[in-house]
Amino acid sequence: MGEIEGTYRALPTSGTRLGGQTAIGVSTLEPEQSLSPRMQEKHMRIRVKLLDSTVELFDIEPKCDGQVLLTQVWKHLNLIECDYFGLEFKNVQSYWIWLEPMKPIIRQVRKPKNAVLRLAVKFFPPDPGQLQEEYTRYLFALQLKRDLLEERLTCTANTAALLISHLLQSEIGDYDETLDREHLKANEYLPNQEKSLEKILDFHQRHTGQTPAESDFQVLEIARKLEMYGIRFHMASDREGTKINLAVSHMGVLVFQGTTKINTFNWSKVRKLSFKRKRFLIKLHPEVHGPYQDTLEFLLGSRDECKNFWKICVEYHTFFRLSDQPKPKAKAVFFSRGSSFRYSGRTQKQLVDYVKDGGMKRIPYERRHSKTRTSLHALTVDLPKQSVSFTDGLRTSASLSSANVSFYPPPSSSLSPPGLPNLKDSSSSLVDPQAPVIKSTAAERSSGPSSSDGPSTQSAHLPGPPVLRPGPGFSMDSPQPSPSSLKSHLSLCPELQAALSTAEQGASPVLSPVLSGAGTARMDNQEEQKHKHMPEDEAYFIAKEILATERTYLKDLEVITVWFRSVLIKEEAMPAALMALLFSNIDPVYEFHRGFLHEVEQRLALWEGPSSAHLKGDHQRIGDILLRNMRQLKEFTSYFQRHDEVLTELEKATKHCKKLEAVYKEFELQKVCYLPLNTFLLKPVQRLVHYRLLLSRLCAHYSPGHRDYADCHEALKAITEVTTELQQSLTRLENLQKLTELQRDLVGVENLIAPGREFIREGCLHKLTKKGLQQRMFFLFSDMLLYTSKSVTGASHFRIRGFLPLRGMLVEESENEWSVPHCFTIYAAQKTIVVAASTRLEKEKWMQDLNAAIQAAKTIGDSPPVLLGGPVYTRTPRSSDEVSLEESEDGRGNRGSLEGNSQHRANTTMHVCWYRNTSVSRADHSAAVENQLSGYLLRKFKNSNGWQKLWVVFTNFCLFFYKTHQDDYPLASLPLLGYSVSLPREADSIHKDYVFKLQFKSHVYFFRAESKYTFERWMDVIKRASSSPGRPPSFTQDCSHHSPGLEAEIREKEACPSPCLDKNL
């Protein structure tokens, strides 16, 4: 097959992929041409070491700016995506400095004639798929090769061996033990690489048939998941004098202690970066620092070091976050303050547009390999054209094919003003319908020397498109706990991905105003060719569900172990004894699950990756990992059993310590605390139940003769023993958490937590008053019925209106008496009230729970419930047929203290029940534990045919939306109480597979899953917790509408309180 125009560009150097160093530089002068003596005075030769270790000589004028040299280098290499690269040199202090384009070289480089500058990657994008040129990815792979050798890219021995094996495949071709050993003996990839020799050879055997382009992509794909990917340390110290390392990445400024990341200051949180002498200053936005200091200070070694790091931060921020370079400030007439430095190159957005629009003619280049061997697999396979598919794993197919692939990096965030204020998150990679089609060919590999080989070409499959995910780590607003609790494991398994289509024509859809910066993938509405490379075994999808939910679970634990701990340490608000009790019981659990997640990620990577096609199925299982870890969980039973003690002591401490109470309330208002704080204390025990359910599905899927069945069955037995032992503890813990949450949210009530009191149901009913039917929030407990009204002061708390003891209570239907649909009468010892439910099913659920609770209350002692601080009704007893018409309550009476609570979260079940006119029972909350799910979904834009990729977490009857699974807090939420889930109808014009529809009144959303299994799982869990938890299917139509008679009495409420997806979209 002949060479395809525009695929390869000729490397004008003699450097090879083997990395052999060239002893002499190559001049840019023509052969036999020399400079005249006069010209030699006006020119100087500068040596530049390229990424393949060859040295080039460039002739420039002594007083020219750095941009002149850079332009010569880019032209010499025919490098299109040149803005990712730069030239660096060592200064007097022997640390590396980037050559500034707008400054004369002689003012930067000392003795430039003797200096050796080197080409290096300057900006590391979070995803290699954002690099559109194969040649650019090749240079990035060479940079990572250099970083490995210089020990900048620190990683485990296994990961280093895997990286080197892909570099070997790229440079010398398919595995040959003799040649591999000779090559590794002659070339150093890693210090002391002899220790990893056998691992390298073992990994290399698995890459048979992999082309150089695919190997490059695999190197980038593995490296970008390492915490040290693209990190360049700058030694510093904090205000206390602690030695730290500062670094900068696409996401913001990073703080390390040793090689452990302890803090991340995202660009969106930073208001301004500055330096003053040796001090580097980070000013945060007011909403980030809150009551804490708004300026963080770090001390570097010298003013030059500090200014150098500041310049790098400015360049990184401009390149990744802005659409265009900021305009230069006007020069001061008399005096100027501060540095005039600014980034002078193109931003990533501008570079993307330039390459997309054709920017520069692509000149073919050849990959010349010495001692390479022919890969029959790569040379014989030639599949038809296919569209890009977002699949899991290391995105290359086991069967290579020729493919038409369009890579399109992210759209930029909205234009920001010069400097650093008002920063917004940038989007991730998109597939653009108009992006140019790139066809790749692989140079023929032969067994002879490269000098005698002719460059024949063959179609090869480009690595798959990008998965959107930010750099590793999590952002923090304050100093962190011990570094041991923050160590990061290698994650080889990427997140769930969704199939995206490409088209040759048509404009990209417009991003929705909300979540536009969060979208991680976009699709056009044209017909899509499907070609997904992922295992089809249901066990694989169950394993991937374990991975996805484990990632969410670990993030939930970090809310306490990292974020809450950080605030407590900073404020010194918690007694030492309570702090020891809290973290001694949750830290070991957190560390265990970090290790477990690491194992699952690596297993899934091997299961999904291209190497799995050459194995005998040893890695296409998960039971051995589950069995080992489920058995270890037994050792943590004592920790799980003490969580109710932790919750009780925490509640007592907040009552007696005003400072702790203030810190607690303030922390709950932070975005990272997306659920009530005490809810996260339930997660460890609830996760055990989830393991049991997942293992049950695995055992049901496998036949008894399957190699993984025995391990899964034993793991199920082990976790069942643990959950059985902890069942009473979980029930007690869930009840205690609910009572604690209600006591915090209800105004005018104290001592709600009482021995023997159990929560039964909460929900919205309409109470008959002198004004007619008034909406009230009712709470049914094992000893009383409590009802509240929403505050009219703008706060989202509920104020106690009254309570009725269950002893002696009687409940009767009274629709005929009052002519109000779905109403019933509650007769208490001293009061009678008439209430109406929104539907027949709601009425039946309330009456059933009330009657059951009344019967159970007969066995409780005679002591009345104690509720201090709320209005207790002590009116004269009335006859059983007399109805109490509630006074005009909304205009008078003490409202209680609500200061500081106006921002209270509005997606709790209490608030959602209020707005959706529904109710939730204790059984529903317990069932919700079994209906938790995480993963990537595509959300359809409202006003276009585009799809937006989001990480979605379903918990506590609510969908939470993130850009990626590594985000610390959700961008939006959608409570699902009251929603119905169904398949799209023909009128919806949705022509995609695995799409489900969510609807509540006029609010309609479409979501798309990546496979049949995930589609069915999302449908299943949402059905169980949508319109009304626990609803029988036969009641679907009856419950979805209010009764006509009641509509006149009930004012239509907004579907969902802000913040939520309803209101924003």
UniProtKB/Swiss-Prot annotation:
One GO molecular-function entry: cytoskeletal protein binding
Induction summary: Up-regulated by TNFSF11.
Keyword Phosphoprotein part of the UniProt annotation: yes
GO biological process per UniProt: actin cytoskeleton organization; cell adhesion; hair cycle process; neuron remodeling; osteoclast differentiation; podosome assembly; Rac protein signal transduction; regulation of integrin activation
Biased composition (Basic and acidic residues): 524-534
Domain PH: 758-855, 930-1027
Keyword list, A-Z: Guanine-nucleotide releasing factor, Phosphoprotein, Repeat
Residue spans of biased composition, Low complexity class: 440-459
Source superkingdom: Eukaryota
Location of the DH domain: 538-729
Transmembrane annotation, as ranges: none
Region of interest called Disordered, as start-end residue ranges on this chain: 406-489, 504-534, 874-902
GO cellular component: cytoplasm; cytoskeleton; cytosol
Record's function text: Functions as a guanine nucleotide exchange factor that activates RAC1. May have relatively low activity. Plays a role in the response to class 3 semaphorins and remodeling of the actin cytoskeleton. Plays a role in TNFSF11-mediated osteoclast differentiation, especially in podosome rearrangement and reorganization of the actin cytoskeleton. Regulates the activation of ITGB3, integrin signaling and cell adhesion.
Entry comment, domain topic: Intramolecular interaction between the DH domain and the PH domains can stabilize the protein in an autoinhibited conformation.
Assembly and oligomerization: Interacts with PLXNA1. Interaction with PLXNA1 or PIP5K1C lowers its guanine nucleotide exchange activity. Dissociates from PLXNA1 when SEMA3A binds to the receptor. Interacts with PIP5K1C via its FERM domain. The interaction with PIP5K1C is enhanced by SEMA3A binding. Interacts with RAC1.
Protein name, per record: FERM, ARHGEF and pleckstrin domain-containing protein 2
Source species: Mus musculus
Underlying gene: Farp2
